[in-house]
Amino acid sequence: TNAFGMGIDRSDVRFVVHFEIPGSVEAYYQEAGRAGRDGEAAFCELLFNYADTRTQEFFIDGVNPGASMIRDVYQFFLNDADENYEVHRTLDDIKESIGAKNGMAIGAALGTLMRGQWIERFDIPGSRAKGTRLLRPEVLTRDLTIDEAALEEKERRDREKLEKMVQLCYANTCRQQWILEYFGEENAPICGSCDVCRGEESSERRAPTDEEGLIVRKFLSGVARMSRRTATGWEGIFGRGRII
């Protein structure tokens, strides 16, 4: 995780593997930084396939619902509210009703409406579900004040960050130098340890050590447990079509 105060709180993490590309260089730097905090040698591996960017694009769509979807969600509340201006419907109900493809975007739309003080969320007694209350039910959907420019700018920044992460993966210069310059450090030195700096050495082939072989077997065992048997063979539940 790239969240502060969460994840593995150990200083002796020796190995960090990214099975898919993170959404930004900032996220990658924070996540990879979990390794070797005790100052000893540690290794970070990023398994990259451009097709994996679709996962991050899905997340970007989920946190950037757009003004049109926000208005659709608000109109749903106007249509469904009871005499107390309350709606006792789940996020899945809302998603199905307005024809949204990304359920995450419904939650993001609710967040925007709450920050604008158009709605509030409340606990439903005797249930773990939450309801929604209209705070200004007299306001029609067409009269909602939504900063569309700010929404568009945030989505643009999110997509730009993903593109920068892709550029890092394709870069033919020192990875550490690239990252440091991304964060504004000028004339950053090369690390001498990344795959680019190692050059031809990184392409040499050799038999794995016993310890490396054990790691590979454990890794493949985990992949197998995330698969299921079908009529035509084994099919991955997660990471389908990925190169590992």
What are these regions (language model features)?
Residues 2-4, 8-244:
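C-terminal helicase lobe
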